[in-house]
Amino acid sequence: SNYSMKACEFAFNLAKTENAEVILLHVYFTPIYASSLPYGDVFNYQIGDEESVKTIIQKVHSDLNALSEKIKEKVASGEFPNVKYSCILREGIPEEEILRYAKEQRPMVIIMGTRGKNQKDIDLIGSVTAEVIDRSRTAVLAIPENTPFKQFSEAKRIAFITNFDQRDLIAFEAFFNTWKSFHFSVSLIHLTDSKDTWNEIKLAGIKEYFHKQYPGLEIHYDVVTVSYTHLRAHE
């Protein structure tokens, strides 16, 4: 898909910068795997049709081979950098297998493509991507299909949303350690439904803390007033 190729573009450019290897992980789901899950967790499949399973597996291999060929073409044309990469197939529930692989192999980052504006607004990043972001201990980059960027180095300004939680400081440290080889400024953003001077005081305090922790990092902050009624209407 187009959004998978956009994720590959980011991954290959990042691997070139970090002298790393790219692993293309694809997870597929078959009726046979579904039959091994607890009753009620799966749809009512008619198990026993081995031909349908064989067809699924053949299509998965065909799609992955097609993706690999596209990548080879882009490397040959110079559109993608020439870095080491390999393909891995796993059977199971996509989000579970992605998280399991990340726990086993501890990659630098997980890069996932997301659909463009032609998809439903309610599914902004996709349920699989959302689940991985929520549960992963590894940094996750969700790359929109239509983003004009080709690599992380093109992002010169980063918005960091904070709710003044202690976990935000831990999250920022993990973020900074992952991307510290790049040059960017950071805007600390707090969303609120009412004006409160304390919010700006708290943001200013976080800014000063970050200045001490990360000298040389350009940091700004802003309080954004939003209507939560409006936000809920779009959930």
Where in this protein do the model-derived segments appear?
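Intrinsically disordered or low-complexity boundary/linker segments at protein termini
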Residues: S1-E9, N13, F80-N82, M108-T114, ...
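Glycine-rich phosphate-binding loop signature in dinucleotide/nucleotide-binding domains
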Residues: K103-P107
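Conserved small/polar residues in nucleotide/adenosyl-binding loops
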Residues: T229-E235
